[in-house]
Amino acid sequence: MIKVAINGYGRIGRSILRALYESGKRDQIQIVAINELANPEAMLHLTQYDTTHGRFQSPASLDANVMTIGDDRIQLLHEADAEKLPWRSLDIDIVFEATGALIDRQACEAHIRAGAKQVLISHPSSGDVDATIVYGVNHQDLKAEHKVVSNASCTTNCLVPIIQVLDRAFKVRSGAITTIHSAMNDQQVIDAYHDDLRRTRAAGQSIIPVDTKLARGIERILPEMKDKFEAISVRVPTINVTAIDLSVTLDKRVDIDTVNQVLSQAANGSYQGVVGYTNAPLVSCDFNHDPRSSIVDGTQTRVSDGHLVKLLLWCDNEWGFANRMLDTSLEMIKAVRA
C-alpha cells in the first residue's frame, strides 16, 4: 500500500481523488492527507458535486478537519508553507503536488525536507527534476533514487504516445501542433486584469491564443524529436476536453488506411489503456471522463502527397491526466521497491 498526500485540491487534486476511487486502485494507494487553504466545507462540497464529472459515487462526510470517504479518514490540512507539512509523522510515500505553484525541484524539495519520500508534480517542470514521465512511453526509466518527478502535461501525455507510434512505423521528419484546449481557471469569467493581455478577456466569449512550451515538452520525453516540432495553443469556451490538431511529415509514403491501421493496432496492443482509437462520429463532450491519455479520431485522418499526415486527437485534460498521475505513482514505488 502506498501512502500519499495531495497538495493543492483544485481541478487536478480533486480529479486524482475521484479517479482513485473509480479506478480500482484504492487497494494499492491510500490518500492520507490533503493540504488546501480553502475551508473544509468547500472541500467536501466540491468533492461531492462537480459540474464537469458529476456526483461523487462514494459516500463522503466531514468531521472538523477529517473527510471520511467510505471507511477512509483523510486529514485536511491548511498550511501555506510546504516545509511545515507533517509528512514525516504521516509516513507519506508520495506527495501529489497539484497546486500549480511548486513546479521545480527547488520548490518541491520542501516536501522532501518535510518528510515525504517522493514528489510527483502535476505540471510540466524545469529540467532539474529527476525525471519527466509520460506513462506508457518512458515510465520504465524511473529509478529508485528519483525523488522529484514531473508527470508532464495533459497535452504532452496526449501527443507523445502518438508521435512515438508514428515515428517507429514511418519515421517522423517534422511536425506542427495546434492545441484546442478547454478554458482553465487562470482565465477570466468577465474581462479583468491579467499579466497576459489575451487572458484579460472573458473565457466564455472568445477563442483565446495562449503561449505553450509543448514542443519543448515533447523533446524532453523523445530527445530524437529535438527541433522537429512547433506548437501553438488556443483556449475555447468549453469547460473540459481538449482536441489536438497534429500534422506530421513522414519519411515513408503512407495512405489514410495505413496510418489508421497502425494507430488502431497500437490502441489495442501495447498502448492499450493509454491510447484509444475510434471511427464513431463523436464530439468533444463524448470524451468527458475518459481515462485514456489520447484518443485518435480515425474519421479525421488526412494524407497529402503521401507524406504529410494530419490527425485529430482527443483527451479529457483533467480525468485522463489524473489517471496517469495514479499510474506513474505506482511505477515510482515499483522502482523503489524493486
UniProtKB/Swiss-Prot annotation:
List its EC numbers: 1.2.1.72
Q: What class of enzyme is it?
A: oxidoreductase
- An annotated GO cellular component: cytoplasm
UniProt pathway annotation? Cofactor biosynthesis; pyridoxine 5'-phosphate biosynthesis; pyridoxine 5'-phosphate from D-erythrose 4-phosphate: step 1/5
Site annotation Activates thiol group during catalysis: residues:
181
Positions annotated to bind substrate: 153-155, 199, 212-213, 235
The domain of life is: Bacteria
Which locations, inside or outside the cell, does it occupy? Cytoplasm
Which UniProt keyword terms apply here? Cytoplasm, NAD, Oxidoreductase, Pyridoxine biosynthesis
Q: Where are the transmembrane segments?
A: none
Residues forming the catalytic site: 154
User: Which processes are annotated in GO (biological process)?
Assistant: glucose metabolic process; pyridoxal phosphate biosynthetic process; pyridoxine biosynthetic process
- Sites where the protein binds NAD(+): 11-12, 317
Q: Known InterPro entries for this protein?
A: E4P_DH_bac (IPR006422), GlycerAld/Erythrose_P_DH (IPR020831), GlycerAld_3-P_DH_AS (IPR020830), GlycerAld_3-P_DH_cat (IPR020829), GlycerAld_3-P_DH_NAD(P)-bd (IPR020828), Glyceraldehyde-3-P_DH_1 (IPR006424), NAD(P)-bd_dom_sf (IPR036291)
Reaction catalysed by this enzyme = D-erythrose 4-phosphate + NAD(+) + H2O = 4-phospho-D-erythronate + NADH + 2 H(+)
Query: Could you tell me one molecular function GO term of this UniProt entry?
Result: NAD binding
* Function according to Swiss-Prot or TrEMBL: Catalyzes the NAD-dependent conversion of D-erythrose 4-phosphate to 4-phosphoerythronate.
**Quaternary structure annotation from Swiss-Prot or TrEMBL:** Homotetramer.
User: HAMAP family this protein is in?
Assistant: E4P_dehydrog
Designated name of the protein: D-erythrose-4-phosphate dehydrogenase
Q: Which species is listed as the source? A: Shewanella loihica (strain ATCC BAA-1088 / PV-4)
State which gene encodes it.
epd
